[in-house]
């Protein structure tokens, strides 16, 4: 590996300090670090790193290192896009279901990556589009979830949902979460959605505060085509949020289409813990 892209939480002094140390450590080993321009402006020593626009940082990188929390990783995963580059995610945040590498593991983990000695877990992603009057007006790839949510003063939304062109139900709820297994421990979990092992190939559909109490989360096959048609009064506000980071206002009659993405996010595994240990630790299972 000769080129490593670094994404860091730019408003976190700790992440900036670690990024500076890592850039120097890599330079001493003949490895070029590549950082985003807005990150480069916040680093004190930038001569050892190359910088470019966020969308180009991973263009020809051999590895991506993420320094921050799950939000930083999710943003990086979208920018990596179709390149299938392995991502080493280091947890400098709080919860960190996805960033399972600890700071103490950073340099040993990078050493192994440079030597080609690492394992990856592949996380499925979703493609979400918004169709308006027969035309696609938005198209995005997501790692965690696609969320339809009503505004503060809006009434319950009618969301006519079909799977593979077969009618499922019309959810009458505050919103709907369509999640990957990776995203099942995010917003979906707060809405009583199922916890899905991240290596499963499936999609969960979870209503938010449904009017009908028997509306429960539904899990469908990963290759399913999910279509959600919205119906609500024109003076109400309904929003689409992708991975909690990209959003847009929806209109009544819009159809949100969701399918499995062609590419995956490749996360480097921690050598010191497995997924169930992460669950126990983060959710504090077994504690009183």
UniProtKB/Swiss-Prot annotation:
GO terms under cellular component: cytoplasm
InterPro entries, alphabetized: ATP-NAD_kinase_N (IPR017438), ATP-NAD_kinase_PpnK-typ_C (IPR017437), NAD/diacylglycerol_kinase_sf (IPR016064), NADK (IPR002504)
Pfam families tied to this protein: NAD_kinase (PF01513), NAD_kinase_C (PF20143)
Localization, UniProt: Cytoplasm
Active site: 70 (proton acceptor)
GO MF terms held by the record: ATP binding; metal ion binding; NAD binding; NAD+ kinase activity
EC number: 2.7.1.23
Annotated keywords: ATP-binding, Cytoplasm, Kinase, NAD, NADP, Nucleotide-binding, Transferase
HAMAP family in alphabetical order: NAD_kinase
PANTHER family, sorted: NAD KINASE
Protein known as: NAD kinase
Origin species: Geobacter sp. (strain M21)
